[in-house]
Amino acid sequence: MDLDEAFLYIGEFGCCQKRLTAFLTLLQVYVACQSMLIVLVGAVPEYLIDNEDISASKEEYTKHLHDTNNFTSIVSEWHLIKNEAYKVNLASSLFFAGLLIGNILFGPLSDKLGRRPVYLSGLFFDITFGYCTALAPSYEVFAVSRFFVGIMNGGMALVSFVLTQEYVGKSYWALTGSLTNLIFAVGIAFYALLGFYIRNWRTLAFVANSPGIFFFLLSFLLPESPRWLYSHGYTTEAEGVLQSMAVGNGVERPVVKLKSCPGTSSKSAHSVFDLVKYGVLRWRTILLMYIWYVCSLVYYGLTLNAGELKGNLYLNVALYGLVEVPAFPLCLYFIEKSWSGRRKATAGFLGFAGFACIFTIFLPETNGDLLNPTVLALFGKLSVSAAFNVVYIYTSELYPTVVRNAGLGVCAMACRFGGILSPFIPTMKSLNPSMPFVAFGISGISAGILSLLLPETRNKPIAESIEDLQSPAYQLLSRGNEVLAST
């Protein structure tokens, strides 16, 4: 039997896989806390300077500065105000730069060395640098530690997402992918709750990082991905993992015998360069990189430019996460419908987000409560969050197992560029106040249109090797499944 048949035999989403999925999705709470750390740790407290005529030196400001808040942050500890205020954004940018590097490094590494060892290494160093952040004696150490947390957090989260997918049968990839992103959104709200009760930034950073130890110790119980083992020629080891899953799923006396995977006899190792070498992968990668880039650009663009949320800091952070929650059931509904699927759902959600940006141009200066820039931002963010969720699942299905993490890593790299560039788009306001929203809108709509050039993956078999994509048997099976699903 091949791997998809083996999953049907042992159970695509049995008790064993449910436990593995629950563990890896709960890990996203830790990932979210690390990702959102700077929002509260770098919050600017209200302060008074009793003598505005003093010199602009940091030492003089310190003497005349009075904090009026009941929380601490790196701003209050190291007096990052006035000429030093840029350092908060710099630390945030360093974290995103780390995410960029982590996505580039960890994808190919896990495709070559295996999912499990790369995931465990990333989580270990993520925890280590997380404690360096909490105990940083100076801003410089804090900023550098955030950079390395970004590398480890981004890379480890990418590999854990792929593991979540590869532990289950293909028909459950949409569910497990959506659960991963849903728990990340809930994790943002959980971090806001932590911040509400823990007002000292060092204690908050320490507590937010500590659950990582629990996840790290339990992660040693995780098996290697059977899909990675099978695609790299470790057929016996893959059979062993699948038989253990079968026992955990309650299958009596399971016997799993896999046939050889096409393409594993090749002596050359697969790498990120395969994404350029093969035409079918090259064009998919170009399209997906642009779509991921736009998802990030529009996501952060709507957040930063469609009106600032007023009110309680902790409530706003919680809303920032919770507004994404409805996106996931919407995503699950649309991607499993024959008239929508992955491709049209991606196009629709991106198009909606793009039109939300364009529509902002026509809002009057004084808006009612029902329709204003903040409400439009929340609806747009809901839509682009759904697009992000679909794209994660869609990308996993478009790449063969041997280069799946490399493909996801390259796409995630493009995503980080979108996040880094989005704050600079508002400078276009100097040309015309509507220009930033026009840029975001055109980007979203264009990405939605281009996504229609990608093949649909709903109810199609997962390619294990690059040769599968070019195999007539694979293409025939794909068409057969598509016809069967439409009847």
Curated annotation (Swiss-Prot):
Swiss-Prot/TrEMBL keywords: Glycoprotein, Ion transport, Membrane, Transmembrane, Transmembrane helix, Transport
Q: Cross-referenced InterPro entries, in alphabetical order?
A: MFS_dom, MFS_sugar_transport-like, MFS_trans_sf
Q: Which gene encodes it?
A: slc22a15b
Q: Its membrane topology, per UniProt?
A: Multi-pass membrane protein
Locations listed in the record: Membrane
At the highest ranks, the source species' classification is: Eukaryota, Metazoa, Chordata, Craniata, Vertebrata
Taxonomy, superkingdom = Eukaryota
Sugar-bearing residue positions: 70
- Describe the family membership recorded for this protein in Swiss-Prot or TrEMBL: Belongs to the major facilitator (TC 2.A.1) superfamily. Organic cation transporter (TC 2.A.1.19) family.
For this protein, the parts annotated as crossing the membrane are 22-42, 90-110, 117-137, 141-161, 178-198, 203-223, 286-306, 315-335, 345-365, 374-394, 406-426, 435-455
Q: Under which name does UniProt file this protein?
A: Solute carrier family 22 member 15-like
